[in-house]
Regions:
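Ser/Thr/Pro/Gly-biased, low-complexity, turn-/loop-rich segments
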Residues: 2, 20-259
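Sec-dependent bacterial lipoprotein signal peptides
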Residues: 1-20
């Protein structure tokens, strides 16, 4: 005969196992020992549409140099300063650079863009030996889903990795699927056609350190889907309350029949 105390214990155990995630579901990088070392390589960022570039020119002729280095002394808003000082890459992949005109920079690395701008200035005999510096002003990523602070985040370091990006968003929630994080990235092919590439990242395995998605690039979108426990709890069929109510009814019926 099944007593009432036994019934309560059964229901408690079922609820405990149904709702709890295992360590394998939530721990990061589970296959790494303290002695293991990893060589991490970072790819150079390639300029995309809508990027804002700050281009600084230095030379022995300061008067001619002034036209390439506008001053934002009358602008107080930080976003306005960003746009005022920068050259935005238009839908054709070009920037309209001062008196020189349009320069196609889409798909170039920052170093390649520096070399191109310097070459054009010298070939047009504007400056003899200019020093060119280019910085990307609007580096950002977007993170959505099961993180504590989803949203758009600006960053200003050259090599940002996915763990740092997740940390900026307050870490994953306990309901985040750590084995199938998606990273959407803008890409440009050799024929200049544009597309998005989707990476899948498993944070429970050290393999992701060698993934192309380990490095987060400007414009990346990170999507953290809910894990199976979260989906079950949110559903109707898999809802734990529904399941326990049904089980309670069945067990209660057994007790009544047994008595």
């Amino acid at each position: 005969m099944l007593g009432r105390n036994s019934l309560g214990l059964i229901l408690f155990i079922i609820a405990l196992f149904y709702n709890c995630s295992t360590k394998k579901d939530v721990l990061y990088v589970q296959d790494v020992s303290d002695k293991e070392l990893y060589n991490v390589s970072y790819d150079e960022y390639k300029i995309q549409l809508d990027d804002v570039l700050k281009i600084s020119i230095l030379s022995k002729d300061p008067e001619t140099t002034l036209e390439f280095n506008p001053s934002a002394s009358n602008v107080t808003n930080s976003k306005e300063i960003l746009l005022y000082n920068g050259y935005q890459v238009n839908q054709n992949g070009n920037i309209n650079f001062s008196s020189i005109g349009e320069i196609n920079v889409e798909g170039l690395t920052i170093i390649q863009a520096v070399e191109l701008v310097r070459k054009i200035i010298v070939e047009n005999k504007i400056l003899i030996d200019p020093i060119v510096d280019i910085k990307l002003l609007n580096t950002h990523f977007i993170i959505l889903g099961e993180v504590n602070r989803p949203g758009k985040y600006d960053f200003f370091k050259n090599n940002l990795n996915i763990l740092e990006a997740i940390g900026m968003a307050g870490d994953l929630t306990i309901n985040g699927e750590r084995k199938k994080i998606k990273v959407l990235r803008n890409k440009i092919s050799s024929d200049k056609s544009r597309f998005k590439k989707i990476f899948s990242v498993d944070l429970t395995s050290s393999d992701f350190i060698n993934s192309d998605a380990f490095q987060i690039l400007s414009g990346d979108i990170i999507i953290v889907n809910p894990n199976s426990s979260r989906i079950k709890n949110a559903g109707i069929i898999g809802n734990s309350g529904t399941l326990l109510s049904l089980l309670s009814f069945v067990l209660s019926s057994i007790i009544v029949i047994s008595n």
